[in-house]
């Protein structure tokens, strides 16, 4: 596979940053040419989730296994991987095409057996979570939102979160509409 660069701005005209997806033999890489920052998603790095899942705050909330969980803010599926590693099935909804493309590419390159088992219990869907909830016949035990855009924190977010903030819009009104739809 030859290196290929996809201009995200051609797909999403409202992005101000100069962000690209570079396709390499090792997988897709996000490139922010204005800051020279790059990010590639390697889900094999989620191996630590297997070791630390019982200590994670999500394990205190979701105490049973074999549950059906809907993740309305899929992103790079880190929280979904934690929930799945606890023995649950997760449906990840992500409406951003770029984020979904990076995630699906990373899922296709998983080498670690434990991480592979975790992601076998994760189903991904591209689209609006609100539309999905209105049309699905599935019943979920939990509906999960990650409000990762806490801008009141002065610490610099991780590289993963910095890229997500540049690509994804956090619309609190849509999140409220989803909650209203389920209640």
Give the ranges of each region predicted by the language model:
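Conserved proline-anchored active-site loop of SAM-dependent methyltransferases
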Residues: 69-82, 140-158
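Basic (Lys/Arg-enriched) interaction patch that binds polyanionic ligands
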Residues: 68-102
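S-adenosyl-L-methionine
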Residues: 1-69, 77, 85, 93-142
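A short, acidic, amphipathic alpha-helical segment used as a generic capping/interface helix at domain edges
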Residues: 128-132, 170-183
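Class I S-adenosyl-L-methionine
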Residues: 2-5, 141, 156, 183
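Short, glycine/charged-enriched secondary-structure capping and boundary segments
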Residues: 84-86, 105-108, 139-140, 157-160
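Mobile active-site "lid"/loop adjacent to the S-adenosyl-L-methionine
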Residues: 147-178
């Amino acid at each position: 596979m030859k290196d290929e660069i996809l201009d995200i701005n051609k797909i999403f005209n409202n992005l101000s940053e100069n962000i690209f997806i570079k396709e390499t033999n090792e997988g897709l890489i996000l490139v922010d040419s204005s800051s020279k920052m790059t990010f590639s998603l390697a889900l094999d790095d989620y191996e630590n989730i297997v070791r630390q899942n019982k200590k994670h705050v999500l394990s205190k909330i979701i105490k049973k296994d074999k549950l059906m969980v809907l993740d309305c803010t899929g992103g790079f599926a880190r929280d979904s991987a934690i929930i799945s590693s606890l023995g649950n099935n997760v449906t990840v909804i992500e409406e951003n095409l770029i984020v979904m493309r990076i995630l699906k590419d990373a899922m296709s390159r998983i080498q670690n057996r434990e991480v592979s088992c975790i992601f076998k219990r994760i189903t991904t869907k591209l689209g609006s979570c609100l539309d999905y909830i209105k049309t699905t016949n599935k019943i979920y035990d939990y509906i999960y939102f990650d409000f990762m855009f806490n801008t009141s924190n002065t610490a610099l977010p991780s590289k993963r979160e910095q890229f997500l903030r540049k690509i994804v819009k956090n619309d609190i009104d849509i999140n409220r509409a989803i909650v209203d739809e389920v209640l």
